[in-house]
């Protein structure tokens, strides 16, 4: 296989992979919005438990956001520091 063709295939597949990795950012966004909405409902029901509810929500959102950040890192690596290009020879 021609080196230029192989490089084109690797770059194309890497772009598709980066796009798929960024789709993974939808999950944390939807989940965090849902959690924030439920936290607001909980505070409306029990205003005295506001501190506990908010701190638990923020901890949960931080854990959920880590998956979105990991997918962003993978997408950036595939686009700008592609490890597969060095394997072509």
Curated annotation (Swiss-Prot):
The record marks 65 as: Reversibly protonated during proton transport. The chain crosses the membrane at residues 9-29, 58-78. PROSITE patterns: ATPASE_C. Gene3D superfamilies: lithium bound rotor ring of v- atpase. Keywords: ATP synthesis, Cell inner membrane, Cell membrane, CF(0), Hydrogen ion transport, Ion transport, Lipid-binding, Membrane, Transmembrane, Transmembrane helix, Transport. It is found in: Cell inner membrane. GO terms for molecular function: identical protein binding; lipid binding; proton-transporting ATP synthase activity, rotational mechanism. InterPro entries: ATP_synth_csu_bac/chlpt, ATP_synth_F0_csu, ATP_synth_F0_csu_DDCD_BS, ATPase_proteolipid_c-like_dom, F/V-ATP_Csub_sf. GO terms for cellular component: plasma membrane; proton-transporting ATP synthase complex; proton-transporting two-sector ATPase complex, proton-transporting domain. It is a multi-pass membrane protein. One of its GO terms (biological process) is proton motive force-driven ATP synthesis. Belongs to the ATPase C chain family. NCBIfam families: ATP_synt_c. HAMAP family: ATP_synth_c_bact. This is ATP synthase subunit c. It comes from Fusobacterium nucleatum subsp. nucleatum (strain ATCC 25586 / DSM 15643 / BCRC 10681 / CIP 101130 / JCM 8532 / KCTC 2640 / LMG 13131 / VPI 4355).
